[in-house]
């Protein structure tokens, strides 16, 4: 198995352009109605998060689904429907530059208010932070923080995810100075930062959707929406408990 930091870096460094809308099949209804697989807030003993977070504590059968970007309004809508129907708990890392988050705020905000969905900071427009000046890094984080507060009434602190997983000690410190002291990486992936087939997304999910993993996905290409039934089946058959980062970690 690929080491945690290597897995994050391998996917992160594939390409640098900001995610953009793709010409690919539109999201469609899943083959059968999605069924609820989880209800309520998991009762967990919370731990302090590390400053560099890759996975979850080895307690229980928890898994964290973390979904980035939001290029496609249709995919964001499909994810929200998946969350509402199944009861899964998800942490989104939005880029506020994408209109999808404003468009779907009426649906998303109640899920945020209930705690079923958490929001983290993924910067305003998805640049490689390592290449930016100090002031530009701060602007990317603060602008997105302001957007999340004004739109959803919550702060994303202390969790931020650097675009492409590209970070260094300088970026980490600048983020921490803004209250973002947990650089949130991952140790599992759907691999869908690129356009994959449904079979490829599902194969990645089968490999990485396991206990104690922080799994990264993207609300960009619609491919993942065609395997929502299979993802729900995996969670159910493996007796996984989906969690937000706030469910697991005490940051107060």
Regions found by a protein language model. Give the residues of each.
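His/Asp/Glu-enriched short active-site or ligand-binding loop at hydrolase and phosphoryl-transfer sites
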Residues: 166-208, 240-251
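Active-site beta->alpha N-cap acidic-glycine motif
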Residues: 29-128, 136, 140, 147, ...
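N-terminal twin-arginine translocation
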Residues: 1-17, 22
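A short acidic, amphipathic alpha-helical/loop segment
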Residues: 78-82, 106-108, 170-174, 227-231
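Extracytoplasmic/secreted cell-surface and envelope-processing proteins
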Residues: 74-75, 101-102, 127-131, 167-171, ...
């Amino acid at each position: 198995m690929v080491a945690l930091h290597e897995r994050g870096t391998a996917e992160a460094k594939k390409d640098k352009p900001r995610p953009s809308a793709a010409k690919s099949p539109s999201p469609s209804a899943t083959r059968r109605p999605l069924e609820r697989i989880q209800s309520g807030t998991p009762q967990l003993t919370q731990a302090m998060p590390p400053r560099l977070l890759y996975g979850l504590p080895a307690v229980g059968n928890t898994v964290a689904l973390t979904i980035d970007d939001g290029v496609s309004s249709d995919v964001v809508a499909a994810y929200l429907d998946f969350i509402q129907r199944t009861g899964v708990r998800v942490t989104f890392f939005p880029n506020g530059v994408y209109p999808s988050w404003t468009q779907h705020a009426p649906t998303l905000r109640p899920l945020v208010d209930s705690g079923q969905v958490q929001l983290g900071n993924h910067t305003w427009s998805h640049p490689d932070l390592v290449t930016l000046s100090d002031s530009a890094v701060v602007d990317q984080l603060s602008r997105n923080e302001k957007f999340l507060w004004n739109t959803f009434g919550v702060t994303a602190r202390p969790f931020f995810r650097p675009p492409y997983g590209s970070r260094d000690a300088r970026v980490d410190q600048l983020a921490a100075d803004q209250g973002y002291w947990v650089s949130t990486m991952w140790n599992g992936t759907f691999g869908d930062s690129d356009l994959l087939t449904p079979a490829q997304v599902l194969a990645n999910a089968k490999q990485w959707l396991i206990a104690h993993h922080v799994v990264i996905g993207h609300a960009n290409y619609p491919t993942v929406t065609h395997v929502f039934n299979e993802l729900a089946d995996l969670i159910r058959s493996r007796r996984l408990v989906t969690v937000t980062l706030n469910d697991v970690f005490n940051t107060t």
